[in-house]
Regions:
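Short phosphate/oxyanion-binding micro-motifs
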Residues: 1-141
Length: 141
């Protein structure tokens, strides 16, 4: 993380800008039921080494430790999930728990939002959204 003091010309104000590098991957997987698809996702994440992974359309009713481990093999991880509603949907957010600490999780009908604490920075909110492809459900979206 890098902290910089910036003076805004003409305003007489000074602000502190915090710059940090974070790799976030967001992916609509269209289901993670097959081992083959989970292996493709796992291999990709292993090669990219993200800090946060947001997966839409997991099509999973439950995302337990074993399932999450089959997708992302990083040792220090935490996650939050919104289960499927019927045969579609489902959101899973996984993150490196050494870099980000969960402060709050909000599960919406079509979203997962997480407030993270980061060393030396203000809190950060990240959200993953998956909208329904059903016209009757879209009005609730």
């Amino acid at each position: 993380m890098l902290h910089t003091i910036v003076r805004l010309t003409g305003f007489g104000s000074v602000i502190r800008v915090t710059k940090f590098h974070m790799k976030i991957i967001s992916w609509n997987t269209r289901g993670l039921g097959s081992k083959k698809k989970r292996r493709v996702v796992k291999d990709f994440l292993r090669s990219e080494k993200p800090d946060v992974v947001m997966i839409q359309e997991t099509k999973k009713e439950e995302c337990d430790r074993r399932f999450v481990g089959s997708v992302w093999t990083a040792r220090n991880k935490d996650w939050a999930a919104l289960p499927t509603s019927g045969a579609s949907g489902g959101i899973l957010i996984i993150w490196d728990s050494k870099k980000l600490r969960r402060e709050e999780v909000l599960l919406g009908s079509f979203s997962v939002s997480i407030k993270f604490a980061m060393d030396g920075c203000e809190s950060l909110w990240l959200s993953a959204v998956y909208g329904p492809n059903n016209s009757a459900l879209r009005k609730d979206f």
